């Protein structure tokens, strides 16, 4: 029977993700429109975003946080181009974005001493094969496959190389051992539902040391430059951005952090995400026609949850269109490079009740189109 209730928020996209519950444009009323980001007020606003992010995450005291251009992609690229090349590189690939990093390292930077460990969608490469004498490049959560690393146990405390981690769809949703990561990047529009175009860059003291002791052989564009005169440009990590940010997007980020504080901070955010995943675990357990793409529970993402559905590609498209037409779910098709299926965002800004409601609609639509 066709469900009678609909989700309060039908936005289940994996980026940009749903705004937090109760979101209102009123929350942006203190945006310093028309003011320079270099003014005292502008710098204060950006520094506030940096400090509140650091405090919410509980980062080590000696780690630096900065706002950089071009979303998570910009943040991660600037580190690949600025830090790699002085030792071997191990790259872990198991979905589209991690494959993109491997392509940049081998085809754009053209580094020679590179080992690529690749697994198909739904699986992880063998983490035991990683050599931490090399720099290690990986994503914490594979946004396009719904597969994450199980934990940080495979990363040694003492390592010669740097660990560079794209954590954009994991941070604020998963327990991450920051001290095992030298570079951490993410964007505002994922777990907390901020706006696009801005990246956040977190550096360990070891990453800073690399920047100050190694100069790549290739030219670096202005928006990738993290040093001045051989020293780290610390102003980037105090609110003086490389180029002009959107003060409106920054205000929106401050609003998301305020909401995150209101629900209790990091641990409740992680719990909300896990509770959301549990809705689908129950749904998959009682329906034999839908399956997680991730092969095992320990590597199953709790944010970008990916499914295989026992339907032809045409019927699957029909299911997705039906749910969009009914205004119950937007943007839930799998990523263009991934196996056909569903990808449903379960991060902290999504309400559990909306997912429970969505499950009823997916079941109805499946029976309608099959």
Curated annotation (Swiss-Prot):
Does the entry feature the keyword Aminoacyl-tRNA synthetase, yes or no?
A: no
Q: Which residues carry this modification: N6-(pyridoxal phosphate)lysine?
A: 190
Q: What class of enzyme is it?
A: transferase
Localization per Swiss-Prot or TrEMBL: Cytoplasm
List ligand-binding residues for L-glutamate: 38
GO terms, biological process: L-serine biosynthetic process; pyridoxine biosynthetic process
Cofactor remark from the record: Binds 1 pyridoxal phosphate per subunit.
Question: What does the protein in this record do?
Answer: Catalyzes the reversible conversion of 3-phosphohydroxypyruvate to phosphoserine and of 3-hydroxy-2-oxo-4-phosphonooxybutanoate to phosphohydroxythreonine.
Protein name as it appears in the record: Phosphoserine aminotransferase
- Native source species: Methanosarcina barkeri (strain Fusaro / DSM 804)
């Amino acid at each position: 029977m066709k469900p009678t209730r609909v989700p309060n928020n039908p936005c289940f996209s994996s980026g940009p993700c749903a705004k937090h519950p109760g979101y209102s444009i009123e929350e942006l009323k203190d945006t310093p429109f028309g003011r320079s980001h270099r003014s005292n007020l502008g710098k204060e606003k950006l520094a506030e975003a940096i400090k509140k992010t650091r405090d919410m995450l509980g980062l080590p005291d000696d780690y630096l946080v900065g706002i950089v251009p071009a979303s998570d992609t910009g943040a991660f690229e600037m580190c690949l181009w600025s830090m790699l090349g002085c030792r071997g590189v191990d790259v872990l690939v198991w979905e589209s974005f991690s494959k993109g990093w491997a392509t940049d390292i081998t085809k754009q930077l053209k580094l020679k001493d590179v080992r690529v460990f690749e697994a198909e969608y739904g699986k992880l490469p063998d983490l035991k094969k990683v050599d931490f004498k090399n720099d290690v490049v990986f994503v914490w959560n594979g946004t396009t496959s719904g597969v994450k690393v199980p934990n940080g146990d495979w990363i040694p405390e003492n390592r010669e190389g740097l660990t560079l981690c794209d954590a954009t769809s994991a941070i604020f949703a998963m327990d991450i051992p920051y001290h095992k990561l030298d570079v951490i990047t993410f964007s505002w529009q994922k777990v907390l539902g901020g706006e696009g175009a801005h990246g956040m860059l977190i550096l360990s003291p070891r990453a800073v040391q690399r920047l100050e002791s190694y100069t790549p052989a290739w030219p670096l564009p202005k928006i990738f430059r993290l040093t001045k005169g051989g020293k780290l440009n610390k102003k980037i990590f105090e609110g003086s951005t490389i180029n002009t940010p959107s003060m409106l997007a920054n205000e929106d980020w401050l609003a998301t952090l305020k909401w995150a504080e209101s629900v209790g901070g990091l641990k409740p955010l992680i719990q909300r995400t896990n509770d959301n995943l549990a809705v689908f675990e129950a749904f998959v357990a009682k329906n034999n026609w839908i399956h997680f793409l991730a092969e095992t529970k320990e590597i199953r993402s709790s944010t970008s949850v990916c499914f295989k559905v026992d339907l032809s590609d045409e019927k699957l498209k029909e299911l997705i269109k039906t749910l969009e037409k009914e205004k119950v779910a937007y943007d839930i098709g799998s990523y263009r490079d991934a196996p056909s299926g569903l990808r449903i965002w379960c991060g902290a800004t999504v309400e559990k009740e909306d997912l429970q409601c969505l499950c009823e609609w997916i079941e109805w639509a499946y029976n309608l189109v099959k």
